[in-house]
């Protein structure tokens, strides 16, 4: 089917700008609800990107709700059953939560059918393991292959029309309400396409997020440098690895296929060093676990570095009639916790529950529901987003108090029980309780203060009390402003 023949004489129910992870999910869900959908993407060929390679259990649960879980099949996706956190040579294993402790996965009417909420059997994803494991699972995957699967599921829907072109303008009427988009299409030029509701899903580098507000732009304070490791010997199979220490920035390692492992090395500035190889050799290589060193050293010698900026962007209300901004175009968090796709996919689930059965030509009714949607999404959105930025502050500790909190956090994990069960449930995107997150974060802070007092001893108590006050103030600074912004903004 041609990707340039979309009919501009039709008023579509929904026009979707962008076919990254979120766009095809919105398009598929709305099409299954009977909506006539046009989805526009600049380039439909498989991309090569290092974002969106780790899907937390909360994201997989959302794919099940949408009837799109089979998008992880037949792409050599690699199961993830939990995390291993390293700190100055010690480590602690943190498995994902038990399924019995969570609510059953919600099956959205009209979307889940014919077993499309269950994984298929393939070379790396074993149906029995995913469906019958007593614990939740995540998955590491090659982003481009996953995206192709999502796009193919979307393309199979008869109510979806795909268009390859560059969206150059969001169209508005005399009342300043959004009525569609102008698309530059090969061999056709600039064409106006009309729709009752236009979805902006154009991702991290969104051109159109500022249609909500001119100030809706992300903040960038840090970076990651990525490399591909091949045939790496992971310290713990089927685990994501977080490598911490008081002398280096956080290092993330997770397998994305049987052959390929992604390593992401944090750098605490918006722009990475000019001489990346020297920086990696000096500030990263000495802290890589022994089993990973051969594959790391090979990758370092090849010098194929992939830098990426880390953005933070709190969500704004979708208060423009005829417009819905969703995914990374709306809301971003630090990628340390791998929660981006989880938030975006849960947004799609909630969105479909709110507006999937509405008549989109009733634009005021749709707008009312979108305003409600903004507030209903805050619980899970706030947990994943605030956790990402506060954990990064601790794990990338650049002050005495933050280093104390970093050590205290690791020691807290070592206690086991709820000291790991609750944090990993937040990380997995399956415990949308921001007040409980607050309690756990400050439990870590007070445990850090206790450890410091114990280390100081009786004679050092006055100094320990002063340091405790400073540690508590630091904890408040790295957590509270972000929580308030997410919940109240």
Curated annotation (Swiss-Prot):
EC number: 1.14.14.17
Cross-referenced Pfam families: SE (PF08491)
GO cellular component term of the entry, any: lipid droplet
Localization annotation: Microsome membrane; Endoplasmic reticulum membrane
Membrane-topology annotation of the record: Multi-pass membrane protein
Pathway, per record: Terpene metabolism; lanosterol biosynthesis; lanosterol from farnesyl diphosphate: step 2/3
Keyword tRNA-binding included in the entry's annotation: no
Superkingdom of the source species: Eukaryota
Chain ranges passing through the membrane: 10-30, 426-446, 464-484
This protein's name: Squalene monooxygenase
Organism of derivation: Candida glabrata (strain ATCC 2001 / BCRC 20586 / JCM 3761 / NBRC 0622 / NRRL Y-65 / CBS 138)
Taxon lineage: Eukaryota, Fungi, Dikarya, Ascomycota, Saccharomycotina
Gene: ERG1
């Amino acid at each position: 089917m041609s990707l340039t023949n979309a009919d501009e004489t039709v008023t579509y129910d929904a026009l979707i700008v962008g076919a990254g992870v979120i766009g095809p999910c919105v398009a598929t869900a709305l099409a299954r609800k009977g909506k006539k959908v046009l989805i526009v993407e600049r380039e439909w060929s498989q991309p090569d990107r290092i974002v969106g390679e780790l899907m937390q259990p909360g994201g997989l649960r959302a794919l099940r709700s949408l009837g799109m879980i089979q998008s992880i099949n037949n792409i050599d996706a690699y199961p993830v059953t939990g995390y291993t956190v390293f700190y100055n040579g010690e480590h602690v294993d943190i498995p994902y939560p038990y399924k019995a402790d969570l609510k059953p996965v919600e099956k959205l009417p009209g979307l889940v059918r014919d077993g499309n909420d269950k994984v298929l059997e393939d070379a790396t994803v074993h149906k029995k393991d995913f469906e019958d494991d007593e614990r939740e699972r995540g998955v590491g995957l090659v982003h481009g292959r996953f995206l192709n699967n999502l796009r193919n599921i979307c393309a199979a829907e008869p109510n979806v029309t795909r268009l390859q072109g560059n969206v150059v303008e969001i169209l508005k009427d005399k009342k300043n309400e959004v009525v569609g988009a102008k698309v530059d299409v090969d061999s056709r030029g600039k064409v106006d396409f009309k729709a009752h509701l236009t979805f902006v899903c154009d991702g991290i580098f969104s051109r159109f997020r500022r249609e909500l507000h001119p100030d809706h732009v992300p903040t960038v304070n840090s970076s990651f440098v990525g490399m591909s490791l091949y045939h790496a010997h992971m310290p713990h199979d089927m685990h994501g690895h977080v490598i911490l220490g008081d002398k280096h920035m956080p290092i993330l390692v997770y397998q994305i296929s049987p052959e390929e492992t992604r390593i992401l090395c944090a750098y605490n500035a918006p722009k990475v060093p000019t001489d990346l190889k020297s920086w990696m050799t000096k500030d990263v290589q000495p802290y890589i676990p022994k089993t990973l060193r051969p594959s790391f050293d090979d990758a370092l010698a090849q010098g194929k570095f992939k830098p990426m900026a880390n953005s933070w962007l709190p969500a704004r209300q979708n208060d423009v009639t005829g417009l819905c901004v969703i995914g990374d175009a709306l809301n971003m968090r630090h990628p340390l916790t791998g929660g981006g796709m989880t938030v975006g996919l849960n947004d799609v689930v909630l969105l479909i529950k709110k507006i999937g059965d509405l008549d989109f030509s009733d634009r005021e009714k749709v707008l009312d529901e979108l305003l409600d949607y903004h507030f209903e999404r805050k619980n899970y959105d706030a947990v994943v987003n605030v956790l990402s930025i506060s954990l990064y502050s601790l794990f990338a500790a650049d002050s005495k108090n933050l280093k104390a909190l970093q050590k205290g956090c690791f020691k807290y994990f070592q206690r086991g029980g709820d000291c790991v069960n609750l944090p990993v449930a937040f990380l997995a995107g399956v415990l949308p309780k921001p007040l409980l997150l607050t309690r756990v974060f400050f439990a870590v802070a007070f445990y850090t203060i206790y450890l410091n007092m114990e280390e100081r001893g009786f004679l050092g108590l006055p100094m320990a009390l002063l340091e405790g006050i400073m540690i508590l103030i630091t904890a408040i600074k790295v957590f509270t402003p972000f929580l308030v912004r997410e919940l109240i903004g």
